[in-house]
């Protein structure tokens, strides 16, 4: 390293401690990156890669970004899963002897982002830790931006427990004590025993740690250790630990949550089109985040659910009160993240004004809540701290409209600090003297255009235009600067007054900063109060959101029962209904119980609504178990402990699993974990193998569920032979997605009714997909031949099917009617192009219906 310049040697010494991190190295007004960091960053950020002489034989790769624009570039690297270490100059270059001293002041990782501009308002930014100790795995998760911290412990290996951590949608994972690391694409860090004492929980949590088992303590420690090594400032805003039991909540694996599109769509990975999108009528950012958490963790406690439902009912029934409540909530800023920034030390004066304005809304908010006269809302209101002392303190200390920067002054209110007021007076008097000087010099010289100006280079000056220079009395001024159209002058008296003004302003700005930091530190002492208040406001915000959407969409309060009955009258898919016009949506009933109607065997053609019907029932269950009203005319529901879904086709290329293998693994998971209180949705099990293998597996799965588990199950299939189970297996009932043939065309009615379907209508669906006419008519010819030989798929032997196919294969191809070539319009071409690019494996029924509806509207405009 000796061949490098001292500055590059300094860079390499610092970089050695951050090998897996981009080092943003401050040089003047830029952050520079060198060597491999520069090469990779230039690609990731699409910035120019240059080089510089570093003292070695070759030029060093280098790229850089302006310091004032660095946040945008850092955010881009964080989005791509990278870490960034910010290395600042920690001494004044003018006073430095040799190389300016530099230190890493913070390490920013995807899971430790604190700045609002890097975060999404209504999404948490969690990081999670898994720690395996003494046969159990602790799972801890925290969001540094809000101060939340949760911990639990589960039996089993980390691979199976990983799903619990993934429910937080973490941006980073930390592992401790794992024999084998689970496969994940998330940025991960391994903490070893030399870095972590399992039993030495941070003093902030020491008291609570007494109630944690060693695996939970290890998980918390792993998180705290990682955060401590990356963040070099106070973490006092990190809330007291919330220990929970995962069994208190309705369990869904990652595939089920994804398949039901609870918080994002399968196709676009966006919020729009998900259940969260439909229900999110929250007015605050913290309410939006809490809504997401409630959706991802539905409750099992009937008492808690009834309390929530009663609050929703009260708010739904009083539109005027709810409107006032929403208006009041709209005045509340993101208290959780404001508290985080205040404690972290990066809040500015505007943040504190937002805090004050939010707190000023609390008394009115409490009054509206108390008016509902419901236990949940009254308890929330009674526990709300109005923080009047903080409001008064901030109102006395800070002006109403401070600047963004805390280094410009203009933040502290007159009367807060006596010495600051004196400096303000001195500054004002100095500027008054300047104005008087300007007027006096105009009168003395007779030059009306004379003016006194200021810039940061020359300070105060007297400016006279070239046309008036001859009128300047000799010896009156000292020339300072010549411009194209003017001359600038100074006088000893002006420079003396300038020194006084600038000294006062410099002292004033520095004192204002010190006073602001003191104000911020004083408010930081009350972080727990602010966090408790934020949590209560978020809860009422979610409850009013449920009431608002329930009122607008005509949802009803579900009746929660313990009998095992599950009856929905005129149920609707909440999201599909919202996308389609209300009057066009076809509602459907469902009736299930623990004995006679345990398994609904659903038959019918593709696109007839089977999958939508199944998802609809699961979503209604989730909505009821988060305390929301449901889309139905009437609903009597038993509480469900787990939901399993096997809907859609997807392979696992990374894991080396085929579509059929994934199907079998997910079905096995449901069969192993489900209980009599679970809800299972199985879509076309067995379709990925031969007909008879698939049919045998499907029947065996149904029998196992009926005889060994007893879970309520919806099972869709194209194996019409399975419909015979309704006559031989207690608890199995046939229902079908009704459709009609009219003039050779298939009409989907989207109505689920009792009984089995006679056909699957696959050729009709292929025709809708605009398969070539030759293929459609040839398929019809083959089907006719199969039906003539008795091979209709209604239970004939495999040999009959094989004979029929052999006969058809050896028969001459019948003449197929050729249709004349028709040229499509521009609209039709555009629709066909979309259709060709459509990935059917990742398209949900809701996506398909939305597409069909949009295409139909396009064609109607022709």
UniProtKB/Swiss-Prot annotation:
**Membrane-crossing residue ranges in chain numbering:** none
Any GO CC annotation of this UniProt entry:
cytosol
Which cysteine residues pair off into disulfide bonds? none
> Per its UniProt record, what PROSITE patterns does this chain match?
DNA_MISMATCH_REPAIR_2
This chain belongs to the protein called DNA mismatch repair protein MutS
Listed GO MF terms: ATP binding; ATP-dependent DNA damage sensor activity; damaged DNA binding; mismatched DNA binding
Give the organism the record lists. Brevibacillus brevis (strain 47 / JCM 6285 / NBRC 100599)
Methyltransferase in keyword set? no
